[in-house]
A protein has these predicted regions:
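Ferredoxin-like iron-sulfur electron-transfer modules
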Residues: 46-66, 100-123, 376
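Glycine- and acidic
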Residues: 2-7, 59, 75, 117, ...
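Non-heme iron-sulfur electron-transfer modules
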Residues: 40-46, 77-113, 134-160, 462-469
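Iron-sulfur cluster-binding cysteine motifs and their immediate structural context
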Residues: 32-38, 69-93, 120-147, 339, ...
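Iron-sulfur cluster-binding electron-transfer modules in prokaryotic oxidoreductases
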Residues: 29, 138-473
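Short beta-alpha connecting loops at secondary-structure transitions
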Residues: 3-12, 50-59, 75, 99-106, ...
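Conserved glycine-rich FAD pyrophosphate-binding loop
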Residues: 1-63
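Cys/His-enriched microdomains
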Residues: 59-68, 72, 119-122, 126-129, ...
Length: 473
């Protein structure tokens, strides 16, 4: 079973059987090309020779034995590096740094690791679900991103954190402009222009594909008679007779809209409000919603302090609106829900899939169904173990469902689908094989993932809330 056991095979099986093994090996592999010295080896000290060095590199990954179980879960597998390979390169870089050996090799590894190890890492941490000891290689990469950030990067991040509303307006405006351009200029021409701009700016200009549409902004609940923050708590339930809920529309859902379909689906925020009201809830949405963010984008880019600042502002807002957690809080993006749940001292936030299944679907009447729906379990939904809830909601809206099995994380990873689109294209390269002929729509619980899947799957992907609203309309 390997070099560590090879010196003891004869002791285990005896000289006669051991000799037969050598004769069989000689017949099948006379040149000694297949695993030479791995299973059979005359050197009784081979198990203590040529040992792989595993220097301490990062406490997050130091337990890794490089077994490779993580590799199939990684969206950059067969593109750049896998989690195992990222760890191996990290260890080699640390060894070279400590020993001073071969500075030129270290410089090359440091330089090449930027793209192969960091830029093309989605930081989805699905590797941890496959790892026997739960190692989060993505967290290691986020830490390295933070270590590589300079004064200019932190200044830009601080500006973005302090002007979140302006940034959101700018991004939504950019996508709106691209939408308008496609209305008067052929889409291939628009994409050619953006690709030229990307080449001239070393990929600093985002790629805006035809699958990306401008978002709806803030939704409009039916009853906004009172600003909950004026008194510090929402309207008493006795005044309406309806249970109340705080709904936080995630920033991707506000900035990026759903693809147009023949079913007239609502964008995610308005679909969520409509569903919650249809199920009998009074919906409370933050009045000053523009710029509110869970902080995950800052953290994934390597700006933990700015992330904490942004997260704290949202947590304070949600705490006030929910009367310190007395009212349930729900958001529509699995990524945001997971991040908000992990904040120290944060109030509980439910993801849309679990809340819609438990609290909304039982109060609805399903009036129409699709023949088949494709289901994508995004990385945060997998880490939250939401697959059963997502599939149950999809089954409520369709006669059959097709769970995408050829992809794990779609590789869109926040804005990587805009700046490193090749990662999304690689991760979804086989998704068409998962979609039945009678399937005309797919669902996801993150709007950016839905955009990437729409581009590469051949059918539009929308939010679960949008589909459930249509089915119960």
């Amino acid at each position: 079973t390997g070099r560590a056991i090879a010196p003891f095979v004869e002791a285990e099986w005896g000289p006669k059987a051991y000799a037969i093994m050598h004769r069989i090996k000689a017949l099948f592999d006379p040149e000694g090309l297949l695993n030479p010295g791995v299973l059979l080896n005359p050197d009784d000290k081979i198990h203590v020779k040529n040992l792989k060095l595993m220097p301490l590199a990062d406490e997050i990954v130091d337990l890794c034995i490089e077994c490779g179980f993580c590799e199939p879960a990684c969206p950059s597998h067969h593109m750049t590096l896998t989690p195992r390979q990222r760890i191996a390169v990290k260890r080699e870089r640390e060894r070279l740094r400590r020993t001073g050996e071969d500075p030129a090799r270290l410089a090359r590894l440091d330089h090449d690791f930027q793209y192969a190890g960091m830029d093309t890492c989605a930081a989805c941490n699905l590797c941890s679900l496959r790892c026997p000891v739960g190692i989060e290689t993505g967290t290691m990469i986020i830490g390295e991103r933070a270590n590589r950030r300079g004064a200019t990067g932190h200044a830009v991040a601080r500006f973005a954190a302090d002007h979140r509303g302006t940034i959101e307006n700018f991004m939504r405006g950019g996508v709106t402009l691209a939408d308008a351009a496609r209305a008067i200029i052929p889409a291939p021409a628009v994409e050619a222009i953006t690709e030229t701009a990307r080449r001239l700016t070393n990929k600093r200009v985002p790629r805006v594909s035809r699958a990306l549409h401008h978002g709806p902004g803030a939704p409009k609940p039916r009853d906004n008679r009172q600003d909950p923050r004026r008194t510090g708590f929402p309207v008493p339930i006795a005044q309406t007779g309806r249970p109340q809920i705080v709904y936080f529309p995630a920033c991707p859902s506000r900035m990026f809209g759903a693809p147009k379909t023949e079913h007239g689906l609502l964008d995610t925020p308005q679909a969520m409000v409509t569903l919650l009201e249809r199920a009998g809830f009074d919906v409370i949405v933050p009045e000053q919603l523009n710029g509110q963010c869970c902080g995950q984008p800052f953290l994934s880019k390597g700006f933990p302090e700015e992330s904490k600042k942004v997260s704290a502002a949202l947590n304070a807002e949600l705490s006030e609106l929910s009367d310190a957690g007395r009212l349930a809080i729900v958001t529509d993006a699995s990524t945001c829900a997971k991040h908000l749940r992990e904040l120290p001292g944060a109030i509980p936030v439910a993801d849309s899939a679990q809340f819609l299944l438990a609290e909304v679907l039982p109060r609805l009447t399903i009036r129409q169904k699709l023949a088949s729906v494709a289901v994508h379990h995004n990385c945060s939904a997998q880490r939250l173990a939401e697959q059963p809830a997502t599939e149950a909601l999809a089954r409520a809206c369709a006669e059959s469902i097709a769970v995408l099995s050829s992809i794990t994380c779609c590789g869109y990873a926040g804005d990587k689908g805009l700046f490193i689109p090749e990662l999304n294209a690689h991760a979804t390269r086989r998704v068409g094989n998962d979609i039945p002929a009678n399937c005309e729509l797919g669902v996801s619980t993150v709007s950016t993932c839905a955009s990437g899947l729409t581009e590469h799957a051949g059918i539009p992907f929308v939010s679960l809330a949008s589909l459930l609203e249509w089915a119960s309309r």
